[in-house]
């Protein structure tokens, strides 16, 4: 009967209905070499993963190998397969572009000489993801194109009188803004958003460009009498008004991070022992480590039940007795349950120095439900930090809808810190929303959400987007030194009123 239905109608109604019920991202997983329908079914139905990006994130958190039929080798193969697949799509995370940027720059400098090439565009502006790697080249289209002829030439996708767009062998698009008479002009006009450039020219007119300073546009700002605005701040017209009236703040730098807050050890889904993570953090120059393993509701991540918490706290005490000039703090990433409560009793929550409250399950919510859930957690007196505020995964999963100003207002009222989750797939809270948090004197905490020692380096990506929001070290919790952080923890614990 099904064959007859296909022959008569050209489709199978039952199959069509099943496809309609299946998330688009799950169907897309069929494009991944080595993952058959059976394994994809497990990923979707048992792990609750509905997109390729979510799957990659789960692999990097060591969660895939916890399920039957998936081991360490399979997990690594899935990571490599996904990375290859995504590299042949459109947009790339900032961190992905950063990994290949030195090779691209060296390649272009070899072709055109260092003084004739300049980085520009979204990557230079430190945006969280990049569609094209953009450069200004002091040369014409006719001179450039022959230089790209090689045994394996990049594909020329588009040519205009002032630009060339190539697709590199790694899948990344390379945009070259060309011309020998307008290098400085091209560099300035592509190093800010359209809103910023339009506002600048509306106020000050068309700048007079200097070919003597083709790779440095600081002279443009001094020539109109305002303070220099670096490319990472050239997003909105408002920044011009701020630069008119005074110096812009000294934004936070990677060296301003004094402690690692929010990391996972092999007590839950991390790769390294607690002791190894502490030693590595100390060796890297940090003053403290806030170990925040998953809570018991995160069964998929081997979350900690009460007896394991007691054992971990005992180990932390023992390790701290042998550490000098460095301290491990007791923390937990406690799941925010569907009703907004945290998944431990007050008696258990009181044993932690820091409680990070995060949503990890039932992410499909209306704004009303998401707000009720988050604000209930923020109002819990034991919540110290609100973790990854929207639950988004960049280029993979939209965050649940929230009214960010009301969330920030609630954090201000309850003395709750807002995490800037520095994992390059999250970067959540969005940097565009941080300005309001700073206005309300809410502390930001740039945290790596590290599941390995290697993950400590993700702090850098959080710092880069924090710079876009003009966060200073004084406005960031993880910039406190050990003594300041100990005092913060004690003040916060003393303020708890039930």
Where are these regions (language model features)?
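Accessory alpha-helical DNA-binding modules that contact the DNA backbone or grooves
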Residues: 1-131, 138-165, 169-173, 183-185, ...
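Short acidic-aromatic active-site loops that bind/stabilize oxyanions
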Residues: 94, 266-267
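Two-metal-ion RNase H-like nuclease active-site motif
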Residues: 117-119, 259-263, 333
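Charged catalytic cores and adjacent phosphate/nucleic-acid-binding surfaces used
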Residues: 126-208, 213-265, 271-285, 296-326, ...
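Active-site catalytic microenvironments in core metabolic enzymes, especially phosphate/sugar-handling
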Residues: 331-334, 461
